[in-house]
Swiss-Prot record:
Any Pfam family hit: Lectin_C
Name of this chain's protein: Snaclec alboaggregin-D subunit beta
Family membership: Belongs to the snaclec family.
Protein's UniProt keywords contain Disulfide bond: yes
Annotated glycan sites: N47, N137
Swiss-Prot/TrEMBL keywords: Disulfide bond, Glycoprotein, Hemostasis impairing toxin, Platelet aggregation activating toxin, Secreted, Signal, Toxin
Length: 148
């Protein structure tokens, strides 16, 4: 009887871990996961608006990447450095639609600011945590993100 309860409890734990909250946190095969989100680097180069539109077509809730911690920036910079042969990639912060009100394209709050305002769109460098404002019509690779 004791052995049956132990085995049953073990199976229950496995079942709950597979069917509970963790089950919905899987990213598609070619996406990388970090802190409840899925990320993917795209090598093709597009202007900011086309890259954002492309991201929204990849998965429900997907946008150009937004950053909310230094650790998240580090993760994406490492991922992009390994994948891209270019120095810059588009990120989701802009002030295209709101004049001087900078915001992330996914609607989340702008937690910190690490750039000089010169153009309306931002790129991040593939080898450090610097952000640069660039002409939105320039073409760069980009990273998409969605909540798992």
């Amino acid at each position: 009887m004791g052995r049956f309860i132990s085995v049953s409890f073990g199976l229950l734990v496995v079942f709950l871990s597979l069917s509970g909250a963790g089950a919905g946190l899987c990213c598609p095969l070619d996406w990388s996961s970090y802190d409840l989100y899925c990320y993917k680097v795209f090598k093709q180069q597009m202007n900011w608006t086309d890259a954002e539109q492309f991201c929204t077509q990849q998965h429900t809730g997907s946008h150009l990447v937004s950053f909310h911690s230094t650790e998240e920036v580090d993760f994406v910079v490492q991922m992009s450095y390994k994948s891209l042969d270019t120095t810059f990639f588009w990120i989701g912060v802009n002030n295209i639609w709101n004049g001087c009100n900078w915001q992330w394209s996914d609607g989340t709050g702008l937690d910190y600011k690490e750039w000089r305002e010169q153009f309306e769109c931002l790129v991040a460098k593939t080898f450090d945590n610097q952000w640069w404002s660039m002409d939105c019509n320039s073409t760069y690779s980009f990273v998409c993100k969605f909540q798992a």
